[in-house]
Design a protein with these regions (language model features):
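Transmembrane-helix motifs of polytopic, lipid-linked glycan transferases
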Residues: 193-215, 251
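Transmembrane-helix signature of polytopic, membrane-embedded enzymes
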Residues: 206-231
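Membrane-interface transmembrane helices that cradle and orient dolichyl/undecaprenyl
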Residues: 214, 252-271, 377-391, 436
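Short acidic/glycine- and proline-prone juxtamembrane loop motifs at membrane-interface regions
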Residues: 235-245
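Membrane-interface alpha helices of multi-pass inner-membrane proteins
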Residues: 267-288, 404-410
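Perimembrane helix-loop-helix junctions
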Residues: 290-320
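Hydrophobic/aromatic-rich transmembrane helices and adjacent perimembrane loops
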Residues: 413-456
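Short periplasmic/luminal acceptor-recognition loop of GT-C membrane glycosyltransferases, typified by
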Residues: 482-536, 545-566, 585
Length: 593
């Protein structure tokens, strides 16, 4: 081999070895670069440590201070991303729970009218309240003037008298028919049965209405229980005409809610009109206010939805249903000649409004205290929260304006009494339901454990409802059996004297606070206005009272010494009557000369 060939061979070996070394170096560099890329995509500190170990195996020369800083920053960013993912998952769970609750509420509102109503509570409270009835002898002593007049009405009709003619009647004809039937059969015990049925159907109708209104069976049951509590304290002893109208008023509210949900047809408004007629035949003035407001609310709804033809057709259907029942019942007053008197007397609450200084201040203070302590004012204010359905807006409109109108009428009526607030129940109870529903949703959003409605009703009002209820029940008992016990005994003595010194055809008149004396003595009244403390607001009624006494010439007139005698009445007593010697300090007995 020549020298040139040897040099070429050496050069080839060196180039080959250099090329081999270059390939090995390239492999090492590629391995280190791949390890670094894996580190950059890592999200956990543990993974970065593993990559670090792998890179150390490949070669410690690849590691630098810059890669360590990069690993630290990537670890922190991965931790932040994990926190964001966890927060989003929690928010998603809350949204899913809220959607589930809304779906449950929608399904409940859709099928509310088809579910059975729990009957244990309405049956128990209806029987309990029905047994505390003024038709029973012991409870009769606690009856108010209005209750005694209504009891007299039923008894007088069983004696052949007619309402609006022989006695002044502010209630509907159907109510007086129920009172007469109760007096004819079973010695007024049947009145207790009628009252129990009225309580029961009013409570069940209220439950259905509230359940459809707020889509909550829990609130429906609580408002139903509140209804029985208010009925017990405001209408202690029962026998008020409002009780018999409540099933129809609550039923009409439920009908409106069902219609707005698309569950009622236009033709079904005939049944709505029939219910309105039955309510009108119980309490005319209250029913007029309710159905007038309902008509305005439905009209506004039809105008907004551009359903003018539907609204007109529904009005005709409702008018037909009303007329089918009204004409046969109203014909009774035409037949006995009292139709004109019936219209005049049943609207007494609207005609007798007097806003003078005589009784206005006393009524204003008394009824404002009841509004505040029983929670009606709170329910009115809290019901103005945002509502979500057209049914809630409709019922809130009717209830708010109805509550205001009834309060104005009650304040302007001369006759004062807690029983006047019974007319607030068809308007106040839906507002209570809206109030409770709003508070319950607030509790659910804030996840508050103590979400009891009774805690809200009593505690938020400083337990004033408890004090008001205790007063309304306790005062009549204390007044009758402690403060005026001698008065009741003396009245019974005079009633026995009248019964034994007069014939069954003789009439009497009681210038007293109640109409107890007539039934106790078994004698009819000489005037359609049974007492001087009721229905004498208009001047014409005061004039009619004196004229009827002069014309009928009652054999006995009993005067309560605690009541002022008008000059016209005193003149009649002086000219035509003489005193009868009777022991007692509360009454004076006069006999016709």
């Amino acid at each position: 081999m020549s020298e040139k060939e040897k040099e070429s061979h050496k050069l080839g070996l060196s180039v080959g070895s250099s090329f081999q070394n270059t390939q090995e170096l390239r492999k090492v560099l590629e391995q280190s670069i791949s390890r670094e890329e894996e580190v950059l995509t890592a999200s956990q500190p543990v993974e970065s440590e593993q990559n670090k170990e792998e890179s150390q195996v490949a070669g410690e020369e690849v590691e630098t201070e810059a890669s360590a800083g990069t690993l630290s920053r990537l670890s922190r960013s991965g931790h932040r991303r994990r926190e964001k993912v966890e927060a989003r998952s929690k928010d998603q769970e809350d949204v899913e729970e809220l959607l589930e609750d809304q779906e449950d509420e929608k399904s409940l509102g859709r099928y509310a009218t088809k579910r059975p109503v729990p009957l244990s509570l309405p049956i128990a409270f209806s029987v309990l309240l029905g047994l505390v009835h003024v038709a029973l002898p012991f409870i009769n002593l606690l009856a108010t003037n209005q209750q005694t007049q209504d009891l007299y009405a039923g008894w007088a009709m069983s004696q052949g008298q007619v309402p609006y003619g022989h006695f002044f009647g502010v209630n509907g004809l159907l109510y007086y028919g129920i009172s007469a039937l109760g007096s004819l059969v079973g010695g007024q015990i049947l009145l207790v049965v009628f009252q129990i049925l009225a309580y029961f159907f009013a409570g069940t109708s209220l439950y259905r209405m509230v359940r459809s209104l707020v889509a909550s069976e829990k609130i429906a049951g609580q408002v139903q229980l509140l209804f029985y509590l208010l009925v017990g304290v405001l209408g202690f002893g029962g026998n008020y005409a409002v009780f018999y109208s409540l099933p129809f008023l609550f039923g009409s509210m439920n009908f409106i809610l069902a219609y707005l949900e698309g569950e009622k047809t236009d033709e079904s408004f005939a049944s709505y009109g029939a219910g309105a007629c039955l309510a009108f035949m119980m309490v005319p003035w209250l029913s007029m206010i309710f159905y007038l407001l309902a008509f305005l609310g439905l009209t506004a709804y039809h105008v907004k939805q551009k359903k003018f033809a539907h609204g007109f057709y529904q009005f005709l259907a409702g008018l037909l249903g009303f007329s089918i029942l009204f004409y046969p019942l109203g014909y009774i007053t035409v037949w006995n000649g009292s139709f004109g008197y019936a219209i005049h007397q049943t609207l007494y609450s609207l005609r007798s409004l007097q806003f003078d200084a005589g009784h206005l201040f006393a009524n204003l203070v008394y009824y404002c205290l009841l509004l505040l302590t029983l929670g009606f004012a709170s329910a009115f204010v809290m019901s103005f929260r945002k509502v979500s359905t057209s049914g809630q807006r409709m019922i809130r409109f009717v209830s708010c304006f109805g509550l205001l109108l009834v309060v104005v009428i009650v304040v302007g009526t001369p006759e004062q009494g807690a029983y006047q607030f019974l007319s607030l129940l068809p308007f106040g109870l839906p507002l209570f339901a809206l109030w409770f529903a709003g508070e319950e949703s607030t509790y659910q959003r804030r996840k508050v454990k103590n979400n009891s409605i009774w805690y809200l009703y009593f505690f938020s009002q400083a337990f004033l409802p408890i004090l008001a209820m205790a007063y309304l029940v306790g005062y009549p008992v204390v007044n009758q059996f402690v403060l005026q016990n001698n008065l009741a005994n003396e009245r019974s003595t005079i009633a026995h004297y009248i019964k034994s010194h007069s014939d069954s055809k003789d009439t009497i008149y009681a210038w007293d606070q109640t109409a107890h004396l007539y039934q106790e003595s078994g004698r009819l009244a000489a005037s359609a206005l049974l007492t001087p403390t009721a229905y004498l607001g208009p001047k014409e009624n005061r004039t009619n009272l004196i004229n009827q006494i002069k014309q009928d010439k009652p054999k006995f007139i009993v005067v309560n010494k605690d009541l002022d005698v008008t000059s016209a009445m005193q003149k009649v007593l002086t000219q035509s009557y003489e005193k009868v010697n009777q022991k007692g300090s509360h009454y004076t007995l006069y006999q016709y000369k």
